[in-house]
């Protein structure tokens, strides 16, 4: 069987599928444009290990490994805050794990497809180094405060 012989989805099924994907995912270009606007309306979370974050992360992202996503670490954020999560790239399921945890906690979430690798492939620079101290972290959305209990 090849693509010409396979039955394609009807247009409504395709529309439903792709609209659902767009409600769950965003891409590096959209995140970059939103961050550049100065008022993205979301909190960008790098959910990788501390070493990966220090090695290079999306500017403006906060570090919260997917295993540390819990109500206590989200308590400072308004319930309607949108979180955009990313991990290393398509070979990593950390963003999926983070998104599932956030959704389980009743939080709005999207995954940035491509992750840190996709960010680089699109030609955007990663920032190196450890996260800035908690008391100087500026909210990327202007609506939230730093993660409580986060080193």
Residue ranges of predicted features:
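A contiguous binding-surface segment within folded domains or other stable secondary-structure elements
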Residues: 58-67
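Short active-site oxyanion
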Residues: 38-44, 59-60, 82, 108
């Amino acid at each position: 069987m090849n693509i010409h012989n396979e039955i394609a989805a009807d247009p409504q099924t395709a529309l439903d599928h792709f609209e659902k994907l767009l409600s769950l995912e965003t891409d590096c270009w959209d995140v970059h444009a939103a961050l550049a606007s100065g008022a993205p309306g979301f909190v960008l979370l790098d959910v990788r290990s501390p070493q990966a974050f220090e090695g290079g992360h999306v500017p403006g992202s906060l570090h919260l490994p997917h295993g540390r996503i819990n109500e206590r670490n989200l308590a400072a954020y308004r319930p309607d805050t949108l979180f955009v999560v990313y991990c290393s790239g398509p070979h990593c399921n950390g963003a999926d794990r983070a998104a599932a945890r956030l959704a389980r906690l009743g939080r709005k979430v999207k995954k940035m497809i491509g992750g840190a690798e996709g960010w680089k492939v699109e030609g955007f620079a990663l920032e190196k180094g450890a996260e800035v101290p908690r008391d100087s972290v500026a909210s990327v959305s202007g609506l939230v405060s730093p993660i409580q209990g986060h080193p």
